[in-house]
Swiss-Prot record, chains A, B, C, D:
The gene is aroC. Pfam families: Chorismate_synt. The keyword Amino-acid biosynthesis applies. Belongs to the chorismate synthase family. Keywords: Amino-acid biosynthesis, Aromatic amino acid biosynthesis, FAD, Flavoprotein, FMN, Lyase, NADP. Reduced FMN (FMNH(2)). Its cofactor is FMNH2. FMN binds at R115, S116, S117, G276, K291, P292, I293, P294, T295, R317. Pathway: Metabolic intermediate biosynthesis; chorismate biosynthesis; chorismate from D-erythrose 4-phosphate and phosphoenolpyruvate: step 7/7. PANTHER family: CHORISMATE SYNTHASE. GO terms for cellular component: cytosol. NADP(+) binds at R39, R45. This is Chorismate synthase.
Length: 376, 376, 376, 376
């Protein structure tokens, strides 16, 4: 599977193309609508958001609601037209402005924001949401939520997946801990008042991923590598930890095996469901560090690149934090990565064939006869 | 540039192939020798290490010490022959054993360790060390060191690069803080006694990387994405944070601009030298979370996959920690990533041409005439 | 550079995404308009063509007519709406119908034509035409024309490029030999009457390509491999020969060197401008074998896949031949391949930098000082 | 699956790395030995050949004769040591000499031949031969032979595959037509006397390839595109035609369907077994144009790049023709392409799982229930 994302934040469309989707898959557009809505509607988002309805259109690869095996293209129209703006020459710390100017050398910083703003994550969100229709066929569920905002950390995170989802959905900041939610809302209010912006952390979990997904052949097909590759493409993401961040002592960290009704279980899941680049049947979970938005409400020190004189960053209306929407985007990203690795494992063709392949291949027993001709 | 790594830990060779290296580059084999030696010689490494001399041979792409533009192949012989071993059927928590058995279904866990052991990082180390001969031509320097081992954290890290390197090299665990080094050695001794293993953290810095390296075109050519992709392929790596982990408030985190002698400077470098996927001229720095080695000195709970009865993991002689060598490997990984992005920026051909291209393209001034035909 | 093409022939848009285009390039939309018109307007095209105006829109990566370095997306709307059609279960020989049904297993052959019809080549044509704005900056010109249709072969092909273009453009079938053009028109008329379809051959030339483009590092970066990879993705293409098809004797075939005013010249160009995967400074030229359209005007023998009874292929209004439009498509394909290889050579960033790099690197002299430190 | 090939013709080894091979596959080294022998031993090969024994070693990814899922590395030692040679500054027409000098700018043409000589095809031959152990599991057989040498064309080519193989193997030039073989041997003798070299044509057939292999999703996953990509990477290959070269009239060319015992058959196979980028169940067959060797026995006109004076190409002992060994190399290339596409279709893991997947998925019937929820 290959995902291509294009689009400028004030262009006509954001575009996602998914190649390698099996044929015969029924796409539930409601999921896409819901995830785009979630990405847009959370506490702390600014005015631009409400100008965009995040309608979307699937313009290829789907016929009567069913995939055809051809590339699937999703277009998300940008509602906010491109206002005539003055040339901007004062770069904002934390944004691509300066770095892109040095590389691309076009003398208007407005240009670079078109590609590098978080607007393109709407296309990633749509692509991930579309792939949930695929994951559902294999009983794989993906869920993302906020675990930290500014200095407020979530403490009580339900273990039960449905409760976790419900509590998250009840939170204006997608944090399943109601008490922390209140603290986070206060953080947002205070930051807004100060003109400050907030970073934080997000956790994403994939439940139901079978053991054996990923690879140790090509280094870049290791599931960890795929996670690193896509998550670090998300603008606000500056850090990714797979599984527990507390990894100081082997005895505390390594997930021992036990048997439960004759089946293998783990007591803990510090490793995040991946061992050696391949899933081990436990939840795949990822912690993501999300940086504060670079567009602050009070000016920061900068330099006017035109005059090479000190200058202050301009005041631009913006969100206070990208952490809650980042939880939606990261959920989508994990859906993309798991789908990609799952399809690499199962091959291509018709979804019913892939499901049959999947169904026929339960966990191996030691004496299954594999490698039968091998003589040591 | 493309890096391919192959080799089994008890096979004849570990193999690294680098495609896309410019012609005419003088390779300093001494660097490779030194880095392989560093990877092998640090406190806490077990006996296997001393059995390997990490000789290496460059068998293609270099003629008389100069690259030819053809793929460069490095072979690192494995000295430790493959001992006859019994079939192993008890998976070790934290290792690929169980996950790979489910995927590949060959009934001997010894098989999977061949590819998934950290032994292949010797090839990555060699490849990164070779690329230092490239980076040197552009005055780019890469340095990695240990910042945490078990519960001991480094506090005093010199800002001066040469002092940093010197202090790191004086430390048996590659930690530039002498006091922390002592603590870390104690941690290792204690862990060894207990049969425990240690995780920790590593920091890698690339100094001298020019602004403008990376891209915002293809998502996966963003420098962050490249870092995520390669670092997460390293067996022991479970987490990567680019720049500071303290990213909770915009005012504290965003690196403001200032002018110094008419040149743009930053007061801080929390962003780790990358904005929007492109370097901004500051040091690129990365924190890496390294998990404890899964082969503990005391048995862990497991299951015998042959009998499906509870079992204990076998005692295998092993290192206590992979953190110090991981600092060498991560240094190599950053050298690979920076080289790759630099070559994408500069194109291919002869190194002298690339250097001329590089030299001719200083930072743009606003009125440089780029985009001159554009009429707003 | 990476080209992604999506779109169903009756969907809303055909989509081309180009990643890795340098910033600051002025796009001449007139070229795109012209090439789309040419693809559509030639003798022998059927009715569907006139229903499509091949309007197009560049919806990303271009700001005020100038590229920004972000992915460039071109949308070409499909004018012909999707008529309600009966399920089709009789596969046409030569079309994807049967092969795709076996793979994707959706019981309506209409589905597969959506992706596999030649309609997607409109997106390739647009992408190639857009890249002509890039090639123009480097004085590279690409030209395609018909050399054979049915049994009629072109004999008199002008050597002068401008004359060649003019004569081609005067021909209703894009054949620069006026006499052959007449014969080809007769072939088309006769075939139409008989319900037959016509194959043929196309020649594409890239003039002005500097020596040194391509690579011998990665096998798949050899220019020949890139040509094979893209040309064979074009639906009607079944054969590709680089340079002369008459390659039986070394003495006749190999292009000897001579000096003209102190510069190296070749007497002949049988090798098609590529030696060892790298351009040699002569014209790059490619012969393409184009198969007859699988939708014939008289029924062919087939099988109804629903009943597994013998059946005849349905009558569907169609073109008689794809050879003239294929000459437009192949011209675009060569523009894509040359652009891709040129950008790999020159790197990325701003077009003016790339032009300076290009300008600074004339042909090497033997004593240029490259490899100066090498001591044999 | 990904194939990487490295190695210099006078370096220690030629290297092939295959990533993505399933685990549990028994490798028959005898096939590799046989194909390397065939590549080396045919009429018209020069002296260098006999100096090489083409021993080979599989140094990774295989354990006790069985693949492990890890990358498979094959090393083929180069027996001919690197003789001390004078600097060479006179480029040979048809070889990479001049083009590579312009690109890489190293002042010794001997350098470029290291990578660009046909010597690396020994690694491709070994890789393809190894993959025959995979194809055999799916009853797929690949066969290549010479159809033209100089002006002599094969006429009588047996349709029966075993007879075809036998006759080919009896021919000193791998041409299954005994009469043509004689003519070809005369061509070689005459060419040798004249110092001339010979081009020709090769045909490669894959029998037993199931319908449904390939894809119409990503353009570059079409089977035709994969064939073009790999075949045009082979040094001597200048042309590739899939199926019949006679493609002028639809009625003559398109392969009509018929029923035989209730199964779908074709009367002809002009399309070469691929429709729309996907196999249709017929033999996949490819014609390959092979150029004459650029090292002629009598000097050609050239230029001394050092002095920029006219010069003659040096006399170097060489083969008269690469066509017979090219038939071996192209057979290997088709084995690689078909394996790659087959594995993309079937996914990864253990070979026995892949065989079960394969076995469970016979040709679909129209009413198989795929796409069952679709409501037009």
């Amino acid at each position: 599977m290959r995902l291509t994302i294009a689009g400028d934040s004030h262009g006509k469309y954001m575009i996602a193309v998914l190649e390698g989707i099996p044929a015969g898959l029924k796409i539930d557009e409601e999921i896409i609508r819901r995830e785009l809505f979630r990405r847009r509607n959370c506490y702390g988002r600014g005015k631009r958001m409400s100008m965009e309805e995040d309608a979307f259109e699937i313009v290829s690869g789907v016929w009567g609601g069913i995939t055809t095996g051809a590339p699937v293209t999703i277009l998300v129209p940008n509602k906010a037209g491109n206002p005539v703006k003055d040339v901007r020459s004062v770069p904002r710390p934390g944004h691509i402005d300066y770095a892109a100017f040095v590389k691309y050398k076009l003398p208007d910083l407005n240009v670079y924001v078109e590609r590098s703003s978080a607007r393109w994550t709407v296309a990633l969100t749509a692509a991930g949401a579309l792939l949930k229709s695929l994951l559902r066929e294999f009983n794989i569920d993906v869920l993302g939520f906020v675990t930290r905002l500014g200095n407020v950390e979530a403490k009580n995170i339900p273990d039960n997946f449905e409760e976790l989802r419900r509590k998250r959905d009840e939170s204006a900041v997608f944090c399943p801990d109601p008490e922390a939610t209140e603290g986070m809302i206060s953080e947002i209010d205070r930051a807004k008042e100060e003109g400050n912006t907030l970073g934080g952390k997000v956790k994403v979990i994939a439940r139901g991923v079978p053991a054996g997904i990923g690879s140790y052949s090509d280094l870049f097909k290791k599931l960890d590598s795929k996670i690193g590759s896509l998550f670090f493409a998300i603008p606000a993401v500056k850090g990714v930890v797979i599984g527990s961040e507390e990894m100081w002592y082997g005895f505390d960290y390594l997930d021992e095996f036990e048997l439960e009704d004759g089946r293998i279980k783990r007591r803990t899941n510090n490793l995040g469901g991946i061992e050696g680049g391949i899933t081990n049947g436990e939840d795949v979970w990822v912690n993501v560090f999300v940086k504060p938005i670079p567009t602050t409400g009070k000016p920061l020190n900068s330099v006017d690149l035109r005059t090479m004189e000190p200058a202050k960053t301009p005041y631009v209306r913006s969100d206070v934090t990208a952490v809650p929407p980042a939880s939606v985007v990261c959920e989508a990203a994990l859906a993309v990565v798991i789908s990609d690795a799952l399809l690499e494992h199962l091959g291509d063709g018709n979804i019913d064939d892939l499901k049959r392949r999947f169904g026929n291949e339960n966990l191996p027993r030691w004496d299954d006869g594999f490698w039968k001709e091998y003589d040591r």
